[in-house]
């Protein structure tokens, strides 16, 4: 079933006024850092420099840098003792599955999982004793403990976006195919969609199936996948240029509109709908849901800021802004309210405790 774009008829005069830059959003380059970053700045081990993404399940954090994923707590991060898991650099973004305590990645030969329990290997290997970059007795940088990813589902085509739902269903898409495969109980169902999938999330819902969303940056759309009947949902345009998407609370999705300088809150039951949009002072890329405060955090790369928003009945309200490290393209909010931000071009992770 093909999704239907939900949009009103646009008169030619309005269509002509649409910006040529619509779609294909990328992070706006950061200026040189002038102001001291807020909170604590932690240097990463060399193999985890230039972070491409962050995610978390509870207090366990996943730090991705190309072909390596570091897993552990903030304390292990501070001590330079994250457990490293090698992955194919061609694997897509990490998604979190709290129900099974594993981080999920779509890769060229299938969908892989990284259990949060691999963080225990740091203690098994001697605990959090060596700081990042500290030399071992032999004069070489101390080696980080390692673990291996687990193949959850072999696929006959490369996967670049994958999620595993609370009930155990696996949804697998690709940035160069117009379909999403669903794996359940050894059977595969293929859903036709209108555009390839650049990113996908599954958001738990109490007492029901997860809400699954996907985005395409070229056409700047967001679409829900009907989990119960394994079909494509409706499609909505995300402003002028969707950047990233992240889970919120109870089936909610949060998406940044990088070109339009705003973020949207999306909900779905039978059909996806836009709940509200909130303008941002800078150009947003990374976005995170703060479950403790029931608030939204957004990183704006063009001014090196991390902003906190309160959602209301209308549009959200900016509460405060923190100075960030350069090129903050990854952002998470932990259960205790701690905020982690990572640079895509540097070697640092920023820890903010509001």
Over which residues does each language-model region extend?
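Short loop/turn segments that connect beta-strands within beta-propeller blades
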Residues: 74-77, 116-119, 183-186, 226-230, ...
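Blade-level signature of beta-propeller repeat domains, shared across WD40, Kelch, NHL, RCC1
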Residues: 328-354
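Beta-strand-rich domains and repeat architectures in extracellular enzymes and scaffolds
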Residues: 40-67, 91
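C-terminal motif of bacterial Sec signal peptides marking the signal peptidase cleavage site
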Residues: 5-8
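Short coil/turn segments that connect the beta-strands within blades of beta-propeller domains
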Residues: 57-59, 99-101, 167-168, 209-210, ...
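Bacterial signal peptide processing site
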Residues: 10-13
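Repeated scaffold domains used in trafficking and secretory/extracellular systems
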Residues: 46-54, 87-99, 155-165, 195-205, ...
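A short beta-strand motif characteristic of beta-propeller blades
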Residues: 32-46, 78-86, 145-153, 186-193, ...
